[in-house]
């Protein structure tokens, strides 16, 4: 399946919440009706969504937030289910530990898509080694940095400036002057922001 490249606002409207696909710092709430489905007539009044439909929508929402396609998402779930602990929480932790997401959380990219592009274009290093696989799992203590030749890119400078104003997650430590950050630890569920009900995804795959 090809990656979606259409209007990002349409995806947020479809899920009824801002997925922050355009910017982590600027909400779409003032720009479009998030409570109205995309299309000429929007949401059909009176239509009731089944339990399966609700579970499926939640899975689609999380896939879109993290920019992961179906086959890869299934692999993440299988790995989460294999590990000890809460499957839903572990699933989110695996997604949050992706290199493209960590680059985004550290403020080097204004969106996950932009962060993914930085990784793919070899603008990022992990522990001093160039990394170009967005799905690479970052471990506690790993140092993620922007390569010297990419530090002057306006989009990176602007994204980092906005991230500093908005505040960084507690599980990363960023040195903005050096364009590098440390992945301090895998985030706990309470530290993962976003309107996500991962238990619905567990229920879906448990059918």
Curated annotation (Swiss-Prot):
**SMART domains, per this entry?**
Ribosomal_S4, S4
Q: Which Gene3D superfamilies match?
A: Ribosomal Protein S4 Delta 41, Chain A, domain 1, RNA-binding S4 domain
Tell me yes or no: is Ribonucleoprotein among this UniProt entry's keywords: yes
Q: Which residues form the S4 RNA-binding domain?
A: 97-160
Is this entry keyworded Nucleotide-binding?
no
Keywords in alphabetical order, please: Ribonucleoprotein, Ribosomal protein, RNA-binding, rRNA-binding
Q: Which Pfam families match?
A: Ribosomal_S4 (PF00163), S4 (PF01479)
Subunit arrangement? Part of the 30S ribosomal subunit. Contacts protein S5. The interaction surface between S4 and S5 is involved in control of translational fidelity.
The identity of this protein, by name, is Small ribosomal subunit protein uS4
Q: Which organism is it from?
A: Burkholderia pseudomallei (strain 1106a)
UniProt gene name: rpsD
């Amino acid at each position: 399946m090809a990656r979606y490249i259409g209007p990002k606002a349409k995806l947020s409207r479809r899920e009824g919440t801002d997925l922050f696909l355009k910017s982590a710092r600027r909400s779409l709430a003032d720009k479009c009706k998030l409570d109205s489905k995309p299309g000429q007539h929007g949401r059909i009044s009176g239509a009731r969504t089944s339990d399966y439909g609700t579970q499926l929508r939640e899975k689609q929402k999380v896939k879109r937030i993290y920019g992961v396609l179906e086959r890869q998402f299934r692999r993440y779930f299988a790995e989460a289910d294999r590990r000890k602990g809460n499957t839903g929480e572990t699933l989110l932790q695996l997604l949050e530990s992706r290199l493209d997401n960590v680059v985004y959380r550290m403020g080097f990219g204004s969106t996950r898509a932009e962060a993914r592009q930085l990784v793919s274009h070899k603008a990022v290093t992990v522990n001093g080694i160039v990394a170009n696989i967005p799905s690479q799992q970052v471990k506690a203590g790993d140092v993620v940095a922007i390569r010297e030749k990419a530090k002057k890119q306006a989009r990176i400078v602007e994204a980092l400036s906005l991230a500093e104003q908005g505040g960084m997650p507690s599980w990363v430590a960023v040195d903005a002057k050096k364009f590098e950050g440390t992945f301090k630890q895998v985030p706990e569920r309470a530290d993962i922001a976003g309107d996500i009900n991962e238990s619905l995804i567990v229920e879906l795959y448990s059918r």
